[in-house]
């Protein structure tokens, strides 16, 4: 194990308040412990994501459709990868927020790249890729 290094994190005050409540619910002694676990979870997911070949899955995005240009940018990214997107469901969660769920099928690496591009688009509040098998290799 390497040496401990301190670094700063800037967060919206509302997000920090929710994070602190979550830390209390999960019995974390410090924010640092919770952040370490979050980082570890992301690293484990990265290991899982390195599998290649044909995959299927879902990608869920939550975003504020009022944010300037965001809906158009997300649509452009989806059209650029139309061959991977089998279906899209768009739900109005409330006056401001939308949930978009995409069913994906194709090369695992391409699916992951698309998901990363969409999730990292400025203005996306939350995104989650769930991968599964196409079933072709299952008996």
UniProtKB/Swiss-Prot annotation:
Keywords: DNA-binding, Metal-binding, Nickel, Transcription, Transcription regulation. Ni(2+) binds at residues 79, 90, 92, 98. Gene3D superfamilies: ACT-like. Chain A, domain 2, Met repressor-like. GO terms for biological process: response to nickel cation. Its cofactor is Ni(2+). Pfam families: NikR_C, RHH_1. SUPFAM superfamilies: ACT-like, Ribbon-helix-helix. The keyword Membrane does not apply. Binds 1 nickel ion per subunit. GO terms for molecular function: DNA binding; DNA-binding transcription factor activity; nickel cation binding. NCBIfam families: PRK00630.1, PRK01002.1, PRK02967.1, PRK04460.1. Transcriptional regulator. Belongs to the transcriptional regulatory CopG/NikR family. This is Putative nickel-responsive regulator. It comes from Maridesulfovibrio salexigens (strain ATCC 14822 / DSM 2638 / NCIMB 8403 / VKM B-1763) (Desulfovibrio salexigens).
């Amino acid at each position: 194990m390497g040496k401990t290094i301190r670094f700063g994190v800037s967060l919206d005050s509302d997000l920090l308040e929710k994070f602190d409540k979550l830390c209390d619910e999960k019995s974390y002694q410090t924010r640092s412990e919770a952040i370490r676990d979050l980082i570890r979870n992301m690293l484990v997911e990265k290991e899982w994501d390195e599998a290649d070949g044909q995959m299927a899955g879902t990608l869920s995005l939550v975003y504020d459709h009022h944010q300037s240009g965001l809906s158009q940018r997300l649509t452009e990214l989806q059209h650029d990868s139309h061959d991977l997107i089998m279906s899209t469901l768009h739900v109005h969660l409330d006056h401001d927020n939308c949930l978009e769920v995409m069913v994906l099928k194709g090369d695992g690496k391409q699916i992951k790249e698309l998901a990363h591009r969409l999730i990292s688009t400025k203005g996306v509040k939350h995104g989650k890729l769930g991968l599964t098998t196409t079933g072709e290799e299952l008996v």
